[in-house]
C-alpha cells in the first residue's frame, strides 16, 4: 500500500489531506503559505515536517488503516492481503527539489523529515499487522545514498528503494548494487517508468541481483491535469496496449509463475539472459553457470530468459521459443508448471530434454530436477 499522507512527490496535496489540516495553518503550519498553487486534486503546498499536531493526526489515521487491514484479514480467514506499506511518496523532494518554492535548505528540512518518517513507520511496526515499511527516494541529488542509509537505519523504516526513471541496464545495476550495501536493506527499484520498452530486461536485471523492481504504472488516468503523464502507463489511458505492452506482460508472466525460486534462491544462482544491451539482442547465445549447472541459452527472436537453481532443481523459462542446453547435471525429470499463491509447485505437463537440450515454448516455466 502506498500511504500518500502529508507528502506526495514532496508536495502536500489537498486531495490526500483532511480539510481541517489544510484550513488550519496555525495548528498545522506550512513552510511558506504564499507558495501554494492549484494542481491535480486541488491545493499543492508544503506542510512543515514533524510538527507535533501533524504527526499525531497522521499517525492516528495510519493506525486506523492498519487496524482495518488487520480486521479484514481476520474476517477473511487470515489471508495476508498486504505485504508492505510505503511511508509517504518521494518525501525527499520536499528537502531537495522544492527549496526555491518554500525557501528552506535541505539541511533545514532533512532532520525533521527523517524523524517524521521514522515515527510514521513505527505506527505500522507497532500495529498487530505484520508487514514491512519502506520509503521511496528520488536520485536527482548527490547525497541520495547517504540519506537513504539514514532512513533505512531508523526503527520505523525497514527498506529504502529508489525511483531512477532510467532505462539503462548498467545504471539500474549500479544503483541496486549501491543500495545492497546498506545493511539490512532490501535493495529495489520502487518506481521506474512504464513507458520503457525494456522494462522486461530491467526487471530481470534486478531479480538477477536478488533485488526488486516495480513499474509505474499499469495505466494512467486520462484526467486533463495529467495529460503530460499518460506516457507512464504500460497501457494507454483508454486501456489499449502500447507497442511494448505484450513483451512486458510476457516477461512478468514467467516471473510470477517462478516466484518462489526468484524469492528464495541466492542471487548468484539466478542467471538472467539477454542483458548485455539495453534493447536486448534479437539473435544471440550466452553461457552462464549456477552452483551446479552450466546453461547455454540461445534465441533467434529477442527472448528474455532465466535459469534459477534452488535446492534440487533448476527453474527455467523464456518469453520466446528459445533453447537451453545443460551441462554438469544429470536430469531426473522435467515438468511444465507454475507456483501457486501459496508457494506450491503445480505440475501441468511432463517435458523432455534429449541430450540435455530443452526446446522451450514461449512463456512456459519448466522445473528440472537433477
Give the ranges of each region predicted by the language model.
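Catalytic-core region of carbohydrate-active enzymes that cleave or remodel glycosidic bonds
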Residues: 1, 121-131, 151-258
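Aromatic-lined carbohydrate-recognition surfaces of secreted/lumenal glycan-active proteins
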Residues: 3-9, 68-90, 109-146, 184-195
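Active-site-adjacent "subsite" loops/lids of carbohydrate-active enzymes
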Residues: 9-70
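The substrate-binding groove and active-site-proximal loops of carbohydrate-active enzymes
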Residues: 39-60, 72, 76, 103-114, ...
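Aromatic- and acid-rich polysaccharide-binding/catalytic face
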Residues: 83, 89, 102-108, 143-170
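Aromatic- and carboxylate-lined catalytic core of secreted/periplasmic carbohydrate-active enzymes
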Residues: 201-325
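Beta-strand-rich binding/interaction modules
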Residues: 322-341
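C-terminal beta-strand-rich structural cap/linker in extracellular carbohydrate-active enzymes
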Residues: 347-370
Amino acid at each position: 500500500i502506498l500511504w500518500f499522507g502529508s507528502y506526495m512527490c514532496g508536495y502536500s496535496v489537498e486531495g490526500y489531506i483532511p480539510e481541517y489540516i489544510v484550513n488550519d495553518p496555525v495548528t498545522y503550519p506550512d513552510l511558506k503559505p504564499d507558495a501554494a498553487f492549484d494542481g491535480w486534486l486541488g491545493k499543492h503546498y508544503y506542510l512543515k515536517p514533524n510538527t507535533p499536531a501533524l504527526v499525531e493526526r497522521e499517525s492516528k489515521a495510519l493506525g486506523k488503516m492498519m487496524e482495518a487491514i488487520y480486521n479484514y484479514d481476520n474476517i477473511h480467514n487470515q489471508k495476508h492481503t498486504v505485504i508492505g506499506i510505503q511511508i509517504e511518496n518521494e518525501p525527499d523532494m520536499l528537502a531537495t527539489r522544492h527549496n526555491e518554492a518554500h525557501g528552506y535548505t535541505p539541511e533545514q528540512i532533512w532532520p525533521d523529515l527523517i524523524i517524521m518518517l521514522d515515527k510514521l513507520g513505527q505506527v505500522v511496526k507497532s500495529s498487530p499487522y505484520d508487514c514491512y515499511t519502506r520509503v521511496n527516494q528520488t536520485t536527482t541529488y548527490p547525497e541520495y545514498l547517504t540519506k537513504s542509509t539514514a532512513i533505512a537505519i531508523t526503527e520505523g523504516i525497514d527498506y529504502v528503494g529508489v525511483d531512477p526513471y532510467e532505462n539503462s541496464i548498467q545504471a539500474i545495476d549500479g544503483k541496486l548494487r549501491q543500495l545492497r550495501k546498506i545493511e539490512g536493506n532490501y535493495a529495489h527499484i520502487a518506481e521506474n517508468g512504464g513507458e520503457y520498452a525494456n522494462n522486461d530486461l530491467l526487471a530481470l536485471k534486478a531479480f538477477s541481483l536478488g533485488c526488486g523492481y516495480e513499474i509505474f504504472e499499469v495505466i494512467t488516468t486520462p484526467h486533463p491535469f495529467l495529460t503530460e503523464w499518460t506516457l507512464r502507463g504500460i497501457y494507454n489511458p483508454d486501456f489499449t496496449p502500447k507497442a511494448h505492452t505484450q513483451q512486458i506482460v510476457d516477461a512478468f508472466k514467467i516471473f510470477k509463475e517462478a516466484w518462489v525460486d526468484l524469492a528464495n534462491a541466492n542471487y548468484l544462482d539466478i542467471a538472467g539472459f539477454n542483458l548485455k544491451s539495453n534493447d536486448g539482442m534479437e539473435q544471440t547465445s550466452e553461457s552462464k553457470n549456477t552452483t551446479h549447472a552450466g546453461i547455454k541459452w540461445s534465441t533467434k527472436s529477442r527472448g528474455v530468459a532465466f535459469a534459477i537453481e534452488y535446492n534440487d532443481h533448476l527453474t527455467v523459462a523464456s518469453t520466446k521459443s528459445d533453447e537451453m542446453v545443460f551441462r554438469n547435471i544429470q536430469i531426473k525429470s522435467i515438468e511444465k508448471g507454475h507456483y501457486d499463491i501459496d508457494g506450491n509447485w503445480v505440475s501441468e505437463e511432463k517435458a523432455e530434454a534429449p541430450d540435455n537440450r530443452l526446446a522451450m515454448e514461449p512463456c512456459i516455466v519448466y522445473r528440472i530436477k537433477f
